[in-house]
């Protein structure tokens, strides 16, 4: 009964591949050898014909099966990412022994369930629990779990979980609550979910179990993926099915919907699967991100859980870059869509949103993609601005709405401003002077300036959707406008002393105050100036500050024509977005 096993999964898998290559050689050689033996007849010099080849082929085949069983089992017993030798005590000494034990246990469970169906009492259900408890030390063996589930069948499997819910969680009608889920994990549903994970992830279940996804109740499926880590393939199949069911398909559609919360919880534990869902199933993933979904579930914990799942899937550096970028595009299109309720809807604002804060925290690597899309729209004639696929299909208007949705949360807005500033520092626009004598230098400066201006443009456009006070709005607008100016100022006007640097920072603060006051006076209707004239004045303030800083720090002053060119360039990059932001807020 059982044995202590030590195995190196990677080495064993390599051996399996080598034996497969040997089987292939034998399979290709055997027909020709058989034909040669038949043709030679009695003159064949060999003694046993092709029989040794048959035995060798079957030796390889049976050894492969045994090794695969051992690999699958040790990975369940020792769930780790480490490589090298893994050790553990197997509940069975062979897959055959595991299969026979599973069939016997399935018979005991079925008999206990039939007895319970006759009496529907506490003691009769205790008998079912006792029969299932015997599985605890055995279900990490995939052959055992597969044989057990095959013997029970999908219908009995679901009934065991449903009967536990009926007896232990009668009030949970749209998925298990966290407390109930915890109790289920420590009882028979948890054991059944673990058995399913062991059997399904190793590819040992028949098609009828995949078809179960189409017919099983939502709470059964959401519990199954929440109670034990299922394979990413199965988890995503469950998700795409649940997320396409009619919103009111549940028996009790007005109850709090814990099913989606438990699905999000499963994705929190499996970032790779969630990243793939976002990238490959944008419509279904969009249901999870929908503002109405978030607000109507009746489960406040859902947004926080979804935020953690998004962070796991999207944080910089995780997974393959192309998969992560496609996942980001789904998130941006979902939250920033034309009819999104994240902004301007009738369900309130997202002023304190963990989702907004997480997305703002993780957005830095894709800011250049967003900026390039806006820059190409602003200046299609400038070379080398266009974003590469798949970002070339993202509408900059959607990007602006997405940023605006995030900026409803003040903390997220601050994070976005910092990310934007860091992005401009990373571009290092000052590597090239706007009036460089070489064509390459000027073109390079224009390219970088277009991208910094485009990001400012997006932030300004997004600000029209943010629900800020007038004072906060004016302060942030002035901050957005000065982001590229601040960078140029620091690049071209380096300070050797802390005192001089403090003075320069004060000068920048002064011009920000001037710009903020201009915006505040306009919003408070303390000036007869129009939004258009205020926008022009704000651009002039930027250019005049740069020109003044150059003179005060002994740098070569801008000529009149250079000043005009700088003003036209800045105005062209941000004027329309700035004007729209002022008109919408001031109106």
Where do the language-model regions lie?
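Non-catalytic all-alpha helical scaffold/repeat segments
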Residues: 83-587
């Amino acid at each position: 009964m059982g044995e202590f096993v030590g195995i190196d999964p990677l080495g064993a898998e390599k051996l399996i591949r080598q034996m497969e290559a040997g089987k292939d050689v034998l399979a290709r050689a055997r027909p020709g050898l058989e034909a040669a033996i038949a043709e030679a007849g009695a003159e064949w010099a060999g003694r046993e014909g092709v029989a040794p080849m048959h035995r060798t082929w079957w030796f390889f085949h049976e050894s492969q099966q045994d090794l695969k069983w051992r690999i699958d089992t040790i990975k369940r017993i020792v769930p780790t990412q480490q490589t090298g030798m893994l050790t553990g005590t197997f509940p069975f000494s062979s897959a055959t022994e595991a299969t026979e034990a599973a069939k016997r246990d399935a018979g005991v469970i079925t008999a206990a369930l039939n007895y319970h169906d006759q009496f529907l009492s506490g003691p009769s259900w205790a008998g079912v629990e006792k029969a299932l408890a015997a599985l605890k030390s055995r279900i990490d063996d995939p052959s055992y779990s597969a044989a057990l589930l095959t013997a029970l069948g999908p219908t009995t499997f679901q009934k065991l979980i449903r009967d536990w819910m009926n007896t232990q969680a009668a009030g949970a009608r749209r998925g298990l609550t966290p407390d109930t889920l915890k109790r289920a994990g420590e009882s028979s549903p948890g054991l059944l979910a673990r058995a399913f994970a062991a059997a399904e992830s190793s590819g040992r279940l028949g098609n009828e179990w995949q078809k179960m996804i189409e017919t099983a109740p939502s709470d059964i499926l959401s519990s199954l993926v929440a109670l034990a880590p299922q394979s990413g393939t199965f988890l995503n199949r469950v998700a795409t099915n649940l997320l396409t069911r009619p919103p009111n398909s549940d028996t009790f559609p007005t109850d709090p919907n814990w099913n989606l919360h438990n699905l999000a919880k499963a994705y929190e534990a499996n970032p790779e699967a969630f990243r793939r869902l976002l990238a490959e199933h944008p419509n279904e993933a969009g249901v999870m991100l929908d503002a109405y979904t978030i607000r109507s579930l009746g489960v406040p914990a859902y947004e926080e859980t979804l935020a953690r799942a998004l962070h796991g899937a999207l944080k910089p550096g995780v997974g393959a870059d192309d998969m992560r970028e496609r996942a980001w595009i789904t998130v941006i299109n979902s939250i920033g869509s034309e009819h999104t309720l994240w902004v301007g809807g009738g369900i309130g604002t997202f002023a304190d949103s963990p989702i907004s804060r997480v997305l703002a925290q993780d957005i830095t690597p894709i800011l250049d993609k967003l900026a390039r899309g806006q820059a190409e729209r602003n200046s299609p004639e400038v070379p080398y601005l266009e974003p590469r696929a798949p970002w070339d299909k993202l509408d900059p208007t959607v990007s602006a709405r997405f940023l605006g949705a995030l900026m409803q949360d003040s903390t997220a807005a601050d994070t976005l401003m910092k990310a934007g500033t860091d992005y401009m520092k990373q571009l290092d626009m000052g590597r090239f002077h706007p009036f460089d004598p070489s064509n390459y230098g000027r073109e390079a400066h224009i390219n970088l300036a277009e991208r910094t201006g485009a990001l400012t443009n997006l932030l300004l456009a997004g600000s029209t959707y943010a629900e800020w006070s007038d004072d906060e709005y004016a302060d942030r607008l002035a901050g957005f406008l000065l982001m590229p100016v601040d960078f140029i100022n620091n690049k071209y006007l380096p300070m050797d002393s802390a005192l001089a640097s403090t003075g320069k920072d004060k000068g920048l603060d002064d011009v920000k105050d001037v710009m903020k006051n201009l915006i505040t006076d306009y919003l408070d209707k303390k000036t007869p100036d129009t939004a258009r004239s205020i926008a022009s004045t704000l651009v002039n303030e930027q250019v005049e500050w740069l020109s003044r800083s150059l003179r005060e720090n002994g740098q070569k002053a801008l000529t009149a024509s250079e000043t005009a060119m700088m003003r036209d360039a800045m105005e062209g990059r941000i004027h329309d977005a700035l004007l729209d932001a002022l008109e919408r807020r001031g109106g």
